[in-house]
Amino acid sequence: MTSIIFMGTPDFSAPILRMLHEEGYDIKAVVTQPDRPVGRKRILTPPPVKAAALELGLPIIQPEKLRGSEELQQILSLQPDIVITAAFGQILPKELLDAPSLGCINVHASLLPKYRGGAPIHQAIIDGEKETGVTIMYMAEKLDAGDIISQRAIPIELDDHTGRVFDKLSMVGRDLLKDTLPSIINRTNNRTVQDETQVTFASNISREQERIDWTNDATTLYNQVRGLHPWPVAYTTFEDGNFKVWWATIGKSKHDTIPGTVVAIAKDHFEVAAGNGTTLALYDVQPAGKKRMTAEEYLRGTGSKLQIGDQFK
């Protein structure tokens, strides 16, 4: 029986771990990030992969930093035939990459060589891509640069957001690995070198990328809002406070005013001027110091004094 060490952290990875267990693979250990404080009360919370591993009765290793750690030596001592990673969150050191006889395999949420890096789903939606997918690949020292074993594409629908695509790709990754792993174990799999001329990157989202620039047109802003939904969430500023925009659509109004200006107010939304005469219609918001609410709730309460001509920056 092929022995596996699985490495992953978020919800994306948990169905993949469950599949490996259901298929009867010998999972020597599950490696995941340490428990972290979550929410306003900062409650120490295990990552989803740890929760799944506990449910399945699998050994768990949680290194703060893998490179040079005791946990790394523990992993190496298990002598797995293959290491499988899926959104683990740390770069694997060379001594681990070289250890398994079948190599280290990664389940990556993009159609490589496009969108190497830690935020491929966010970036594909922000960029307005019509398609994304999952790549099963051999791992190399260079981030997401290893040879491609298999890929599976899905469309990005116009109303998709990062959370929805994240869930879709988790299932795609699970199924693609299930279909691909036997050929890897039997050493009959395909292996394609990535075309370096086609490489694009998707680094972790920065605070600046979260900020709405109202001079961009409404399509660009809509892609930004849905690419950052439900985390980390796009924001603007209003009345000297950060104002989160959880959901918005392309507005119907046209304008010739300064971008960021409120140009229309309806019962369940309001429209803000964007670039090139377009508008963004805000439906789900969070004013500074308040909870998330619908635009209708905002306009009845905190935002009841919002007027046409008010300025978001």
Curated annotation (Swiss-Prot):
Gene3D superfamilies: Formyl transferase, C-terminal domain, Formyl transferase, N-terminal domain
Molecular functions (GO terms): methionyl-tRNA formyltransferase activity
Function per UniProt: Attaches a formyl group to the free amino group of methionyl-tRNA(fMet). The formyl group appears to play a dual role in the initiator identity of N-formylmethionyl-tRNA by promoting its recognition by IF2 and preventing the misappropriation of this tRNA by the elongation apparatus.
Catalytic activity: L-methionyl-tRNA(fMet) + (6R)-10-formyltetrahydrofolate = N-formyl-L-methionyl-tRNA(fMet) + (6S)-5,6,7,8-tetrahydrofolate + H(+)
GO cellular component: cytosol
PROSITE patterns in the cross-refs: GART (PS00373)
Residues that coordinate or bind (6S)-5,6,7,8-tetrahydrofolate: 110-113
HAMAP family: Formyl_trans
SUPFAM superfamilies associated with the record: FMT C-terminal domain-like, Formyltransferase
Signal peptide: none
Family from the record: Belongs to the Fmt family.
Listed EC numbers: 2.1.2.9
Name of the protein in its database record: Methionyl-tRNA formyltransferase
